[in-house]
């Protein structure tokens, strides 16, 4: 609770300095990362709603970040309706072309309430994986983009699940040394040229990477 409120307060103060900035309220997986949440709908909606209430006073829109199933996305959207704010959806694909739930990106189009949808991103994915899925996310016909990571892999492994609260994910998943700000920006420019309008970094990206993104033409 403290961290959610504190982050909101800091973001809100920063917005006073930069009025054109929009503050996103991140709503990440409420259970395991990179795994579909198979708990009951009541449990999931309660978790999303509880976090959304904490950050709602500080944010302009909500961002569902690194979700691994369409069910989670639908429940998440339902959980924030009372706040009447737009939202961005960030889906995760560890490897290949399917969400951890086994669903495809194209399955989203018939399952999303798009009335306040700002767009869809592939979230916490490698540049190479975004490239594989670029055409399919583009074919959704809505604003799209990415949050690129710098991990060697994000495919779940048993010890990652077991130690998720006690181990550093960077140690378990490995960190790439080749994705310098310059290299990451080259990927981002390529995706921007292909139509991506939502550009961002996730795990193992640094302020220097984001600065490089901000300078793209």
Pin down the residues of each PLM region.
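Domain-level signal for soluble alpha/beta catalytic cores
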Residues: 1-217
């Amino acid at each position: 609770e403290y961290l959610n409120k504190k982050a909101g307060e800091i973001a809100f103060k920063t917005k006073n300095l930069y009025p054109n900035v929009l503050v996103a309220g991140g709503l990440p997986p409420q259970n395991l990362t990179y795994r579909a949440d198979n708990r009951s709908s009541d449990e999931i909606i309660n978790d999303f709603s509880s976090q959304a209430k904490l950050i709602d006073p500080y944010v302009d829109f909500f961002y569902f970040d690194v979700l691994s199933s369409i069910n989670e996305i639908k429940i998440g959207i339902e959980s924030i309706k009372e706040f009447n704010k737009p939202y961005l959806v960030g889906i995760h694909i560890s490897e290949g072309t399917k969400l951890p739930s086994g669903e495809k990106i194209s399955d989203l189009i018939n399952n999303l309430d798009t009335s306040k949808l700002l767009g869809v991103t592939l979230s916490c994915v490698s540049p190479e994986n975004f490239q594989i899925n670029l055409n399919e996310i583009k074919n959704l016909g809505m604003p799209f983009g990415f949050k690129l990571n710098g991990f060697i892999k994000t495919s779940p492994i048993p010890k990652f699940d077991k130690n998720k609260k006690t181990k550093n994910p960077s140690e378990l998943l490995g960190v790439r040394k080749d994705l310098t700000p310059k290299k990451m920006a080259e990927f981002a420019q390529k995706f921007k040229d292909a139509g991506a309008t939502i550009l961002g970094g996730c795990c193992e990206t640094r302020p220097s990477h984001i600065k490089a993104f901000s300078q793209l033409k």
